[in-house]
């Protein structure tokens, strides 16, 4: 009954949100022009996920990075010598081949109809459901942008950001502190981080020791996974013990001072966000409902609709 109630709450929330944040997108945008669009995307993501589970956190992260730079217009998908894909924060993005595969199939079924920006938004949702998260309805109708510049990627959230900096970056897109905790938590309950992002926390804090605010019984485990003389490219789960499952254990780890990144850890140590973390520690329920709500809100940042932008024939290049 609890899961049924949670799903019902998601639907109610989304019905309200679409009216507020829709900006021209709507649920079922392709119901007549390409009725199998969402099925094609879902099947494609599932097929790739079966052979490479890393595409799930990769696609979720890619969608977030797309929306935080010029809005959710698929600009992160464009390739080129100075495109967003070449920026330092994006060089390790994973899953472009999934979007390209889905686009090829959609062009065969419905030429020139489904945008790459919508494919990415749908793929992010499907990635969550494939990793045991709750699904939600994604408003569609975005069009694709024509500009992609590495120089525009400067304002993406960083692993070392303080809470104040994270709040400033999120509020620039009308995302509040609750959205921040929700989206960071959802993005980090699956996937990994490079050791280079945590070396200073586990070796080079005050007195050349680990950050004293971390769980000191957890530090040796991280030091074994990320040796001090390593090259920093090895990776560790962002949600220790549950890195492949979309669940609430990320928040439980935060409460145990086991947040991997500094930007994670401050969500627990800061009074402004601790109560939200505590709320989301409960199994499913509130977190899943809020995640769907915040994802819809984020996915409508700066969208192009109507005659703005284009429908790319190939996601990596403008028409």
From Swiss-Prot:
Residues flagged as site, Transition state stabilizer: 61
Keyword flag Cell inner membrane: no
Binding annotation for Ca(2+) 1: 66, 69, 71, 73, 75
Leader peptide range in chain numbering: 1-22
Domain of life where this protein originates: Eukaryota
InterPro entries: Haem_peroxidase, Haem_peroxidase_sf, Peroxidase_pln, Secretory_peroxidase
Residues that hold heme b according to the record: 188
Binding residues annotated for substrate, in chain numbering: 157
GO molecular function: heme binding; lactoperoxidase activity; metal ion binding; peroxidase activity
Cofactor requirement: heme b; Ca(2+)
EC number(s) reported in the record: 1.11.1.7
GO CC terms of this entry: extracellular region; Golgi apparatus
Gene Ontology terms: biological process: defense response to fungus; hydrogen peroxide catabolic process; response to oxidative stress
Record-listed Ca(2+) 2 binding positions: 189, 239, 242, 247
Keywords in alphabetical order: Calcium, Disulfide bond, Glycoprotein, Heme, Hydrogen peroxide, Iron, Metal-binding, Oxidoreductase, Peroxidase, Secreted, Signal
Enzyme class of the recorded protein, top EC level: oxidoreductase
Glycan-modified residues: 204, 253
Stored Gene3D superfamilies: 1.10.520.10, Peroxidase, domain 2
Residues annotated as catalytic: 65
Covalent S-S links between cysteines: 34-110, 67-72, 116-315, 195-226
Note: There are 73 peroxidase genes in A.thaliana.
Role: Removal of H(2)O(2), oxidation of toxic reductants, biosynthesis and degradation of lignin, suberization, auxin catabolism, response to environmental stresses such as wounding, pathogen attack and oxidative stress. These functions might be dependent on each isozyme/isoform in each plant tissue.
Similarity annotation: Belongs to the peroxidase family. Classical plant (class III) peroxidase subfamily.
Protein name: Peroxidase 62
Gene: PER62
């Amino acid at each position: 009954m609890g899961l049924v109630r949670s799903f019902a709450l998601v639907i109610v929330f989304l019905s309200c949100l679409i009216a507020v944040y829709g900006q021209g997108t709507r649920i079922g945008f392709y119901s007549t022009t390409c009725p199998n669009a969402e099925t094609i995307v879902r099947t494609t993501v599932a097929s790739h996920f079966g052979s490479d589970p890393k595409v799930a956190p990769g696609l979720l992260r890619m969608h977030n990075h797309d929306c935080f730079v010029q809005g959710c217009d698929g600009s992160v998908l464009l390739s080129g010598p100075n495109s967003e894909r070449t920026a330092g924060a994006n060089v390790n993005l994973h899953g472009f081949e999934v979007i390209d595969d889905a686009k090829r199939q959609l062009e065969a079924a419905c030429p020139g109809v489904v945008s790459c920006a919508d494919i990415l938004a749908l793929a992010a949702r499907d990635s969550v459901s494939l990793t045991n998260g709750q699904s939600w309805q994604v408003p569609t109708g975005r069009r694709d942008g024509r500009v992609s510049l590495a120089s525009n990627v400067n304002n993406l959230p960083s692993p070392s950001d303080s809470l104040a900096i994270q709040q400033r970056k999120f509020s620039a897109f009308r995302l509040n502190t609750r959205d921040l905790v929700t989206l960071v938590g959802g993005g980090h309950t699956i996937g990994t981080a490079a050791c280079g992002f945590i070396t200073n926390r586990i070796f080079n804090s005050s007195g050349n020791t680990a950050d004293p605010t971390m769980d000191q019984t957890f530090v040796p485990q991280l030091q074994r996974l990320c040796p001090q003389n390593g090259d920093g490219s090895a990776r560790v789960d962002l949600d220790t013990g549950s890195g492949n499952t979309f669940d609430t254990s990320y928040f439980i780890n935060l409460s145990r001072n086991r947040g991997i990144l500094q930007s994670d850890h401050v969500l627990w140590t800061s009074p402004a966000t601790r109560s939200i973390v505590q709320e989301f520690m409960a199994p499913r329920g509130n977190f899943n409902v809020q995640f769907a709500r915040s994802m819809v809100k984020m996915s409508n940042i700066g969208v192009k609709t109507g005659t703005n932008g284009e429908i790319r024939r190939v996601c990596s290049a403008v028409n």
